[in-house]
Amino acid sequence: MATKIRLQRHGAKKRPFYQVVIADERSRRDGRFIENVGYYDPTKNPAVLKLNVEKVIAWLDKGAQPTDTVNQILKKEGILEKAAQAA
């Protein structure tokens, strides 16, 4: 089973916020997920990001692939470097 770390959209029309989840790559964007590891709210100024870093690193070690957007967020927060050092 190939897993992805991706954003799941929630919120009202034109007021989105996103949950960062671990999901099977075959499931729908807002469908079934394995684990919730945080949330991201880009509408706040500055954008709010709350992640369980230990869980994200553990899933990266297990082979979960972040989507392009999540990859950019993880790079910006320095989590990918922490995961590389832990490996």
From Swiss-Prot:
One of its GO terms (cellular component) is small ribosomal subunit. GO terms for molecular function: structural constituent of ribosome. Keywords: Ribonucleoprotein, Ribosomal protein. This is Small ribosomal subunit protein bS16. It comes from the Bacteria. Pfam families: Ribosomal_S16. The keyword Ribonucleoprotein applies. The keyword Lipoprotein does not apply. InterPro entries: Ribosomal_bS16, Ribosomal_bS16_dom_sf. One of its GO terms (biological process) is translation. Belongs to the bacterial ribosomal protein bS16 family.
